[in-house]
Amino acid sequence: MTQYTLKQASVLLQSKQISAVELASAYLAAIAEKNPALNGYITIDQDKTLAEARAADERIAQGNASALTGVPVAYKDIFCQTGWRSACASKMLDNFISPYTATVVQNLLDEGMVTLGRTNMDEFAMGSTNENSFYGAAKNPWNPEHVPGGSSGGSAAVVAARLAPAALGSDTGGSIRQPASHCGITGIKPTYGTVSRFGMVAYASSFDQAGPMAQTAEDCAILLNAITGFDPKDSTSLEREKEDYTRDLNQPLKGVKIGLPKEYFGEGNSADVLTALQNTIDLLKAQGAELIEVSLPQTKLSIPAYYVLASAEAGTNLSRYDGVRYGHRAAQFADLEEMYGKTRAEGFGSEVKRRIMIGTYVLSHGYYDAYYLKAQKLRRLVADDFQTAFARCDLILAPTAPTAAPKIGADASPVETYLSDIYTIAVNLAGLPALTLPAGFSGGGLPVGVQLVGNYFAEAKILGAAHQIQLNSDWHGKRPE
């Protein structure tokens, strides 16, 4: 019962072939069996889950259900939810029970979706491997010696392991797309401002965006329909008419122009990644898509620009964790200043501290112009590159990561880890939508994904292209043993 896609589960629930309680119980049993080794979930509450499932069954019986009523979903630990611990995988918030619910979570609760639990992540979403979690690293379900990716690694792992039909993640520099690639699932980062950030704990506010993670592009489209929309509680939320993101799922690819950025197909990629790209190119050609070379010359500037800007925003956002009103507080201190210092020293992990220090440095007097202001200018150049490319093509095909998932504990420096985000970060700098879908396997049997990038508000076009690829391939249907 836990093998269903979100769409399949929806059909079975609406036709009353299964009940929401039966489905939730099956997932809870699978979680109890497999999660201790996977560590994908960090918070489970069976009583809350089953109460939501019973309410969903009542709603279905009364005939006022939505297509998502009764379908289980997992939430990355970055989303606040009333009555649930919302820790952001940090010691700083280990004891924080949220008094309110994030808009995206509330949207899915209003649809009648059933909360399975809260998934592991890199602390405060800062990381690419899920090793920065206070609760220990989540494992890759294809090989537990390897990382699931980050920062939404737990969400990717539980969907891949069939411990949830779908999950919500967040993407600041690739945190939906990179773990989706490493775990062999589909995940989409929408256009910045399309999905409300209210109740999603802030890392870098001008980058953060929530999005769905599931087995298929069709599932992601269905979830995206439910979570998008203007929210007056989020000042960056865009006022636009609601879209149907499933509208292009059956659109053929004939004549669609796909750009191949020459800077993304170089020697920095592993042979496995190049094979996955070629697999996708062959599928696109077979369906009549037109492939053209484009250039994104500022790609090499995206990493330094991102880590200056995101760290600056993180340093500001994380100043709220001081031990005064909520979260961890040091047990012993002589005065207020010492309490602040000890609380933050004890509560934050090493990667979070590193980014706070980088952010404080680049915003400091004498360095603001040299780093922060220059990075903002580079951000515009990166965005302009994409607009030049989209004048010639409809979508861009690119790698998601230069390699398959690395091993847990791989001796990589912070800079090497940052460089693994080279293909995802530029999309966040520009605020564009992008989707990762499975496109093959490494020689070691690990999934490898590719990403489709679109212009602003082209989510339906991206999802349609991904769906057509998945109708003609079966990588998304593979699952770990």
Swiss-Prot record:
It is an enzyme of class 6 (ligase). Its EC number is 6.3.5.7. PROSITE patterns: AMIDASES. One of its GO terms (molecular function) is glutaminyl-tRNA synthase (glutamine-hydrolyzing) activity. One of its GO terms (biological process) is translation. InterPro entries: Amidase (IPR000120), Amidase_CS (IPR020556), Amidase_dom (IPR023631), AS_sf (IPR036928), GatA (IPR004412). One of its GO terms (cellular component) is glutamyl-tRNA(Gln) amidotransferase complex. It comes from the Bacteria. SUPFAM superfamilies: Amidase signature (AS) enzymes. Keywords: ATP-binding, Ligase, Nucleotide-binding, Protein biosynthesis. The active site is at 76 (charge relay system), 151 (charge relay system), 175 (acyl-ester intermediate). It catalyses: L-glutamyl-tRNA(Gln) + L-glutamine + ATP + H2O = L-glutaminyl-tRNA(Gln) + L-glutamate + ADP + phosphate + H(+). Allows the formation of correctly charged Gln-tRNA(Gln) through the transamidation of misacylated Glu-tRNA(Gln) in organisms which lack glutaminyl-tRNA synthetase. The reaction takes place in the presence of glutamine and ATP through an activated gamma-phospho-Glu-tRNA(Gln). NCBIfam families: gatA. Heterotrimer of A, B and C subunits. Belongs to the amidase family. GatA subfamily. This is Glutamyl-tRNA(Gln) amidotransferase subunit A.
